[in-house]
Amino acid sequence: MASMGLQVMGIALAVLGWLAVMLCCALPMWRVTAFIGSNIVTSQTIWEGLWMNCVVQSTGQMQCKVYDSLLALPQDLQAARALVIISIIVAALGVLLSVVGGKCTNCLEDESAKAKTMIVAGVVFLLAGLMVIVPVSWTAHNIIQDFYNPLVASGQKREMGASLYVGWAASGLLLLGGGLLCCNCPPRTDKPYSAKYSAARSAAASNYV
């Protein structure tokens, strides 16, 4: 029962992380306009995401535009787009494997095969979490580096957007859920064989006497 509860908790955390990755991918808030002291860098708030950028006027009006080309993105956001999409696909595979190997499903009859499938699902979730945390941390590092770089113009300085925090939370959920699923140990099947072997030895010894 405890093993099933651990498994359900791991699947739930991983699914929440998977949904958070999709939210991180969709939100155009990887980079936002920076505020330096009490002065606003520009009269507009600029949001930059993986798929579009949005400009929010001081009046509250917002306009979003999809990137015309992949080359319009900075290098870190190009890599982030690829890794986040791969992470979503890999996590979807992990969800499928966790359903197949779940204790409360009948997709597999063998308990050992179920446990092994669940371990594979946990490893897949761990990989998905790593694929998210790498681009999010890379983008955050570049933002901080440019913010304190005196050679970068004030209008080009950005701050970390909400998508980065969502990405960190998503990677944490995926890593935690995958770690819990990897704790599913397959049942041992060598006990019956050892019992039969010992019984056969005792029978042979009695016949010899």
UniProtKB/Swiss-Prot annotation:
Topological type in the membrane: Multi-pass membrane protein
Gene3D superfamilies the record matches: 1.20.140.150
Q: What species is given as this protein's source? A: Homo sapiens (Human)
Q: Which disease is it linked to?
A: CLDN4 is located in the Williams-Beuren syndrome (WBS) critical region. WBS results from a hemizygous deletion of several genes on chromosome 7q11.23, thought to arise as a consequence of unequal crossing over between highly homologous low-copy repeat sequences flanking the deleted region.
User: Among its keywords, does the record have Transmembrane?
Assistant: yes
One GO cellular component, as annotated: apicolateral plasma membrane
Explain what the record says happens when changing Y208F: Loss of phosphorylation by EPHA2
Swiss-Prot/TrEMBL catalytic activity: chloride(in) = chloride(out); bromide(in) = bromide(out); iodide(out) = iodide(in); fluoride(in) = fluoride(out)
**What's the family?**
Belongs to the claudin family.
- Give the UniProt record's GO annotations in the biological process aspect: bicellular tight junction assembly; calcium-independent cell-cell adhesion via plasma membrane cell-adhesion molecules; cell adhesion; circadian rhythm; establishment of skin barrier; female pregnancy; paracellular transport; positive regulation of cell migration
Topological domains, Extracellular: 29-81, 139-160
Record region (Interaction with EPHA2): 1-103
Which cysteines in this chain are paired by disulphide bridges? C54-C64
Which residue stretches are annotated as topological domain Cytoplasmic? Answer: 1-7, 103-117, 182-209
**What is this protein for, i.e. what is its function?**
Can associate with other claudins to regulate tight junction structural and functional strand dynamics. May coassemble with CLDN8 into tight junction strands containing anion-selective channels that convey paracellular chloride permeability in renal collecting ducts. May integrate into CLDN3 strands to modulate localized tight junction barrier properties. May disrupt strand assembly of channel-forming CLDN2 and CLDN15 and inhibit cation conductance. Cannot form tight junction strands on its own.
Query: What are the entry keywords?
Result: Cell junction, Cell membrane, Chloride, Chloride channel, Disulfide bond, Ion channel, Ion transport, Membrane, Phosphoprotein, Tight junction, Transmembrane, Transmembrane helix, Transport, Williams-Beuren syndrome
PTM comment, free text: Phosphorylated. Phosphorylation by EPHA2 is stimulated by EFNA1 and alters interaction with TJP1.
Changing I40D has the effect of: Strongly decreases interaction with Clostridium perfringens CPE
Q: Which Pfam families match?
A: PMP22_Claudin
How it assembles, according to the record, is: Can form heteropolymeric strands with other claudins. Interacts with CLDN8. Interacts with CLDN1. Directly interacts with TJP1/ZO-1. Interacts with TJP2/ZO-2 and TJP3/ZO-3. Interacts with EPHA2; phosphorylates CLDN4 and may regulate tight junctions. (Microbial infection) Interacts (via both extracellular domains) with Clostridium perfringens enterotoxin CPE; the interaction may disrupt claudin assembly in tight junctions.
Which positions does the record annotate as the modified residue Phosphotyrosine? Y208
Record protein name field? Claudin-4
The UniProt GO MF terms for this protein read: chloride channel activity; identical protein binding; structural molecule activity; transmembrane signaling receptor activity
Q: What is its main location?
A: other
Location of region: Interactions with TJP1, TJP2 and TJP3: 208-209
